[in-house]
Amino acid sequence: MTQITPQPGIMDIALYQGGAAHVDGVSNVTKLSSNENPLGPSPAAVEAMAEAAATMHRYPSSDHATLRAAIAETHGLDAERIICGAGSDEIIAFLCQCYAGPGDEVLYTEHGFAMYRISALAAGATPVEVKERERVTDVDALLAGCTAQTKLVFIANPNNPTGTMISEAEVARLADGIPEDAILVLDGAYAEYVEGFDAGAQLIAARHNVVMTRTFSKIYGLGGARVGWAYGPQEIIDVLNRVRGPFNVSTTALAGAEAAVRDTDYVQRCRLENAKWRGWLADQLAELGVPSDTSCTNFILARFASQSEAESCDDFLKQRGLIVRRVAGYNLPTALRITIGDETACRAVAAAVKDFKAGAAE
């Protein structure tokens, strides 16, 4: 029998592992493994989605015009240069599908989001991992890694899973230094957690080869709705729209996202609450001998003395019903990524790590 084989690169893709949500034998758990907003979505978004559910027998908008207009109004952008997707993951895949293929290279940082590599391989391109400097994007290393085959350069700023970010000046230096026929993709999934940060919008206005992606899954609390968007040069957005399915974002998701992006007061509340407990938890863990880099996101990367200690602490937390994220798959085997939950969750994490450390010292 003739064997049916997939395209080159597909079988090199490891199945994506999302954050765990259950612990065997533990009934009451707190999920802190997927960087979800503990406050949930805006009540306005929930109401809008409930109302939209009454029209689910109709196809959704094919051009997402009302959502694009709301995004443009909120962020001061040109709606014609916005594309919406089923999460920013889909747009990352569009970029690789349209601009990278066999013989092309896609650069990303050593601790970068897993979907960059996955999408590159799915397009038949060669993913190229570039070293970071102390868990921070290294612009010089990225520039040194560029070749004539480089077509896409992905960086998350702020980065996941490290929580670190580089300055706008460094991002501009990177944009200036990559090949002119390559696209710099700025993944701004966590941009809303940084007060006043535009995630590269001004840079895009001045360059022909920079795109930023954003999501409604983090500060907006709509991970279950699957909505993302991107902003870039008109020519690139036009290309991406040619491979986008006509009804790729559902009616309820469009309604919820529009209401969420307009509810700027709620976003500010989420930002401030996150900053408060992020700082508190980081300080508590540091006092226990568990340091973390200054985070610009809704999580902290807690660093332990060894992989064994990190894994033992993770097991201990699970028995307390606290689910965090091991990140050995991101080349960070001695660390745990901990989503910033509400006050109760943060206090529970601090208490559990304290008990773990005390037990380990006995």
UniProtKB/Swiss-Prot annotation:
* Pathway annotation from the record: Amino-acid biosynthesis; L-histidine biosynthesis; L-histidine from 5-phospho-alpha-D-ribose 1-diphosphate: step 7/9
Q: Which domain of life is it from?
A: Bacteria
- Tell me where in this chain the PTM N6-(pyridoxal phosphate)lysine is found: K218
GO MF, one term, reads:
histidinol-phosphate transaminase activity
Which CDD domains did the record assign? Answer: AAT_like
For this UniProt record, the keywords arranged alphabetically read as follows: Amino-acid biosynthesis, Aminotransferase, Histidine biosynthesis, Pyridoxal phosphate, Transferase
Q: What's its catalytic activity? A: L-histidinol phosphate + 2-oxoglutarate = 3-(imidazol-4-yl)-2-oxopropyl phosphate + L-glutamate
Instruction: Write down the EC number.
Output: 2.6.1.9
| Cofactor or coenzyme needed | pyridoxal 5'-phosphate
InterPro entries, sorted: Aminotransferase_I/II_large (IPR004839), HisP_aminotrans (IPR005861), HistidinolP_aminotransfase (IPR050106), PyrdxlP-dep_Trfase (IPR015424), PyrdxlP-dep_Trfase_major (IPR015421), PyrdxlP-dep_Trfase_small (IPR015422)
Listed under GO biological process in this entry are: L-histidine biosynthetic process
Spell out the family assignment given in the record's similarity comment. Answer: Belongs to the class-II pyridoxal-phosphate-dependent aminotransferase family. Histidinol-phosphate aminotransferase subfamily.
The subunit structure is: Homodimer.
Q: Which HAMAP family match?
A: HisC_aminotrans_2
Record's protein name: Histidinol-phosphate aminotransferase
Which organism is this entry from? Ruegeria sp. (strain TM1040) (Silicibacter sp.)
